[in-house]
């Protein structure tokens, strides 16, 4: 049963048939796609997804890719898109379609730390996140393993800190540790130090319906220790959409957000006035949609897409007709 039928009066979240897709695409210039769980799972493309995106390009549609994953640079994501068959520009402009949280976090810190002499950030994250920061003039420390120093709390409290750290940035960090958490807290106790999280995704979809813990788990740990909230860059934050809009000159009324998560992709689209499509190849399910439709919570009712598809490969009949 379609979620719209299950949700009573809420007419949103109808299956995107070929006929509906043709009508929708006639009124759309730009399609923004999440990546993990939408285009691919791990290193495997969703069947039919590359063909669908190549067909959209052939129709003259402008594509953008908005990912909360901070473990890759824009250039690395552009290379993965080409490697898995999704097409896209080559050469110096290859990465311009990609808006990842590593890149957008760098833009945010460049704004917030403008005028600061030799800005520096303590990064709980990947070399890619550090590289994007350094590309805009923000030095980074902290990337990589950081074992406990000393025998107990007194030693941990007095472990040396880098001078002039003006922000703690929390991204996806497979080396996250108690020592890093303690250092982050100590930096955040210094006056004026910012706390920035790349995203709040609680888990990441991989192949065969499996998941791993996401960045949101790490951000929450730092927030709890510091007793303050982080500035969040990724979806559903408006900031990441503003990054896209400034570079693309988007008309929201002629733009679609396609994603697999109600609480990030679909909520971002609803907040920014975009049409939304949920694909069922990732995290959220039609059961989740039904729960949101039937909820009395206003914020949950925003997390209901206009349309849904089993996979973005479902767009192919509309594009080939």
Swiss-Prot record:
<keyword id="KW-0119">Carbohydrate metabolism</keyword>
<dbReference type="InterPro" id="IPR036412">
    <property type="entry name" value="HAD-like_sf"/>
</dbReference>
<comment type="subunit">
    <text>Homodimer.</text>
</comment>
<feature type="active site" description="Proton donor">
    <location>
        <position position="36"/>
    </location>
</feature>
<dbReference type="GO" id="GO:0043136">
    <property type="term" value="F:glycerol-3-phosphatase activity"/>
</dbReference>
<keyword id="KW-0904">Protein phosphatase</keyword>
<keyword id="KW-0479">Metal-binding</keyword>
<protein>
    <recommendedName>
        <fullName>Glycerol-3-phosphate phosphatase</fullName>
        <ecNumber>3.1.3.21</ecNumber>
        <ecNumber>3.1.3.48</ecNumber>
    </recommendedName>
</protein>
<dbReference type="GO" id="GO:0045721">
    <property type="term" value="P:negative regulation of gluconeogenesis"/>
</dbReference>
<dbReference type="GO" id="GO:0006114">
    <property type="term" value="P:glycerol biosynthetic process"/>
</dbReference>
<keyword id="KW-0378">Hydrolase</keyword>
<dbReference type="GO" id="GO:0000287">
    <property type="term" value="F:magnesium ion binding"/>
</dbReference>
<dbReference type="Pfam" id="PF13344">
    <property type="entry name" value="Hydrolase_6"/>
</dbReference>
<dbReference type="GO" id="GO:0000121">
    <property type="term" value="F:glycerol-1-phosphatase activity"/>
</dbReference>
<dbReference type="Pfam" id="PF13242">
    <property type="entry name" value="Hydrolase_like"/>
</dbReference>
<feature type="binding site">
    <location>
        <position position="36"/>
    </location>
    <ligand>
        <name>Mg(2+)</name>
    </ligand>
</feature>
<dbReference type="GO" id="GO:0005737">
    <property type="term" value="C:cytoplasm"/>
</dbReference>
<dbReference type="GO" id="GO:0006650">
    <property type="term" value="P:glycerophospholipid metabolic process"/>
</dbReference>
<dbReference type="InterPro" id="IPR006349">
    <property type="entry name" value="PGP_euk"/>
</dbReference>
<dbReference type="InterPro" id="IPR023214">
    <property type="entry name" value="HAD_sf"/>
</dbReference>
<feature type="binding site">
    <location>
        <position position="34"/>
    </location>
    <ligand>
        <name>Mg(2+)</name>
    </ligand>
</feature>
<keyword id="KW-0460">Magnesium</keyword>
<comment type="similarity">
    <text>Belongs to the HAD-like hydrolase superfamily. CbbY/CbbZ/Gph/YieH family.</text>
</comment>
<dbReference type="GO" id="GO:0004725">
    <property type="term" value="F:protein tyrosine phosphatase activity"/>
</dbReference>
<comment type="function">
    <text>Glycerol-3-phosphate phosphatase hydrolyzing glycerol-3-phosphate into glycerol. Thereby, regulates the cellular levels of glycerol-3-phosphate a metabolic intermediate of glucose, lipid and energy metabolism. Was also shown to have a 2-phosphoglycolate phosphatase activity and a tyrosine-protein phosphatase activity. However, their physiological relevance is unclear. In vitro, also has a phosphatase activity toward ADP, ATP, GDP and GTP.</text>
</comment>
<dbReference type="GO" id="GO:0043262">
    <property type="term" value="F:ADP phosphatase activity"/>
</dbReference>
<feature type="site" description="Important for substrate specificity">
    <location>
        <position position="204"/>
    </location>
</feature>
<feature type="binding site">
    <location>
        <position position="260"/>
    </location>
    <ligand>
        <name>Mg(2+)</name>
    </ligand>
</feature>
<dbReference type="InterPro" id="IPR006357">
    <property type="entry name" value="HAD-SF_hydro_IIA"/>
</dbReference>
<feature type="active site" description="Nucleophile">
    <location>
        <position position="34"/>
    </location>
</feature>
<dbReference type="GO" id="GO:0008967">
    <property type="term" value="F:phosphoglycolate phosphatase activity"/>
</dbReference>
């Amino acid at each position: 049963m379609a979620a719209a039928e299950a949700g009573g009066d809420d007419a949103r979240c109808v299956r995107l048939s070929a006929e509906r897709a043709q009508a929708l695409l006639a009124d759309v210039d730009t399609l923004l796609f999440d990546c993990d769980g939408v285009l691919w799972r791990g290193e495997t493309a969703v069947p039919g997804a590359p063909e669908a995106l190549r067909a959209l390009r052939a129709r003259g549609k402008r594509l953008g890719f908005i990912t909360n994953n901070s473990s890759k640079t824009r250039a690395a994501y552009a290379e993965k898109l080409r490697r898995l068959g999704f097409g896209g520009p080559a050469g110096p402009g290859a990465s311009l379609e990609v808006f990842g949280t590593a890149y957008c976090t760098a833009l945010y810190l460049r704004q917030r730390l403008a005028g600061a002499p030799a800005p520096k950030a303590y990064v709980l994250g990947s070399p890619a996140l550090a590289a994007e920061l350094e590309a805009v003039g923000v030095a980074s420390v902290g990337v990589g393993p950081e074992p406990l120093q000393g025998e107990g709390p007194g030693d941990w409290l007095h472990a040396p800190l880098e001078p002039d750290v003006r922000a703690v940035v929390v991204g996806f960090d497979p080396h996250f540790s108690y020592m890093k958490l303690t250092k982050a807290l100590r930096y955040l106790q210094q006056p004026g130090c910012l706390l920035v999280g790349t995203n709040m995704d609680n888990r990441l979809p991989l192949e065969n319906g499996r998941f791993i813990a996401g960045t949101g788990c790490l951000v929450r740990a730092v927030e709890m220790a510091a007793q303050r909230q982080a500035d969040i860059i990724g979806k559903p934050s408006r900031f990441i959409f503003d990054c896209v809009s400034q570079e693309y000159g988007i008309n929201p009324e002629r733009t679609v957000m396609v994603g697999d998560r109600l609480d990030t992709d679909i909520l971002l689209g609803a907040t920014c006035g975009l049409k939304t499509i949920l694909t069922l190849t990732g995290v959220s399910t039609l059961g989740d949609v039904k729960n949101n439709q039937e909820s009395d919570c206003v914020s949950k009712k925003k997390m209901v897409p206009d349309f849904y598809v089993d996979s973005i490969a479902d767009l192919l009949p509309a594009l080939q007709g």
